[in-house]
């Protein structure tokens, strides 16, 4: 749903937009940035990285979440913002990223808000599970 953002959320979207500058996307030229606010208030960043060995690349969202889980596992991700450059439309996470977002929510025991921005608009969900209602469970 398209919403009015708080100052903190607007800043997180701006941080995600800035993170697109660190993306390595020589093949698609689609630069994606992500920024996450942890419960402690710390902000983490991720950007996509493409490889000549195509499946070896990594999306911005998973790059950020894997870093967060490896280094801040006890500090839950409260909100993640996603942005792209070019920004012709809102940037929605791929299926793999949606699955990992739900996995992270389960691991941390709390929902992760997701802000998907682009072209001057933002759509937000209050839990990543809303992006993947029929999630894989082993």
Language-model segments: residues:
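Glycine/charged-rich beta-loop-alpha catalytic/anionic-binding loops adjacent to active sites
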Residues: 40-51, 76-80
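Short, solvent-exposed cationic patches
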Residues: 60, 65-81
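Short acidic-glycine loop/turn motifs at beta-strand connectors
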Residues: 38-40, 118-119
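Short beta-strand scaffold segments in enzyme catalytic cores
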Residues: 31-38
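Compact, glycine-rich, soluble single-domain proteins
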Residues: 48-62
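Short loop/turn motifs at secondary-structure junctions and domain boundaries
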Residues: 25-28
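Short amphipathic alpha-helical face segments that pack within enzyme cores
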Residues: 59, 63, 96-99
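C-terminal binding/interaction regions
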Residues: 1-22, 75-138
């Amino acid at each position: 749903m398209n919403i009015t953002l708080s100052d903190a959320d607007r800043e997180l979207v701006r941080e995600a937009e800035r993170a697109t500058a660190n993306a390595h996307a020589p093949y698609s030229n689609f630069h994606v940035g992500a920024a996450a606010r942890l419960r402690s208030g710390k902000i983490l960043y991720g950007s996509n990285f493409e490889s000549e060995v195509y499946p070896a690349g990594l999306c911005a969202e998973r790059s950020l979440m894997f870093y967060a889980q490896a280094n801040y596992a006890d500090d839950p991700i409260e909100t993640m913002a996603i942005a792209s450059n070019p920004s012709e439309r809102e940037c929605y996470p791929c299926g793999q990223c949606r699955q990992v977002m739900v996995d992270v929510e389960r691991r941390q025991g709390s929902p992760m808000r997701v802000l998907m921005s682009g072209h001057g608009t933002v759509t937000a969900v209050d839990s990543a599970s809303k992006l993947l209602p029929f999630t894989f469970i082993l």
